[in-house]
């Protein structure tokens, strides 16, 4: 990890560690740690939260870290703190795909367990899966959690990392949230992942700035 930290500092200005608020178990907000792979202030410029193929905001070292998933290594500190586990649903942003109050009760079931460094959705499409399906995969995991399933996920994760499969935000995703008019009814909005840009207010409220 020291070698990675030195490489990041030599490659671009800014902190080595990127901190970002995520939604954890039972809706608890916590700060997730990653090796910084983008230029400072990237969330406020260009395509916002997500990076697409060839995104100029991703640093040279960042491209390598993302391709190998080494940018996720600092999350082992989250594991030691008890915020995360090795396997579980990946923790979403506090405002994307939608805010906490917009999740249905069924969708909130994915927060019944600690979020993971890797998970069932990550080995079944990873970044190429739209959010409704991703959440369903997470809920399925909660219903079927077992040591054997976790071991299976870990082996699949290793295979995904070595093949660099499904590691690009390449297409459109569909997000849905309950409407205010009809309880339980959902609306679907098709958006390009690359266009999800948080407002300055959201960034300030969630402290999603690299410190």
Q: What do the PLM-derived regions correspond to, one by one?
A:
Residues 18-57, 117-136:
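Short, glycine-rich, amphipathic interfacial segments at transmembrane boundaries or analogous
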Residues 133, 139-142, 155:
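Short beta-strand/loop motif that positions the catalytic acidic residue
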Residues 2, 51-113, 154-157:
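A short, structured surface patch at a secondary-structure boundary
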Residues 1-41, 147, 152-194, 200, ...:
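A hydrophobic, helix-centered structural microdomain
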């Amino acid at each position: 990890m020291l070698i990675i930290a030195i490489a990041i500092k030599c490659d671009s200005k800014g902190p080595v560690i990127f901190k970002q608020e995520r939604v954890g178990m039972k809706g608890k907000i916590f700060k997730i740690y990653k090796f910084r792979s983008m230029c400072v202030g990237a969330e406020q410029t260009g395509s916002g939260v997500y990076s697409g193929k060839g995104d100029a905001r991703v640093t040279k070292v960042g491209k390598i870290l993302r391709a190998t998933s080494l940018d996720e290594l600092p999350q082992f500190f989250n594991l030691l703190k008890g915020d995360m586990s090795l396997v579980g649903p990946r923790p979403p942003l506090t405002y994307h795909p939608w805010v906490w109050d917009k999740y249905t009760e069924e969708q909130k079931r994915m927060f019944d367990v600690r979020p993971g460094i890797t998970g069932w959705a990550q080995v079944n499409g990873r970044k190429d899966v739209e959010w409704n399906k991703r959440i369903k995969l997470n809920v399925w995991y909660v219903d079927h959690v077992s040591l054997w399933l976790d071991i299976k996920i870990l082996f699949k994760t290793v295979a995904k990392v070595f093949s660099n499969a499904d590691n690009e935000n390449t297409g459109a995703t569909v997000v849905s949230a309950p409407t205010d008019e009809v309880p339980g009814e959902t609306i679907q909005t098709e958006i390009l992942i690359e266009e999800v840009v948080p407002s300055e207010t959201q960034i300030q409220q969630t402290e999603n700035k690299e410190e």
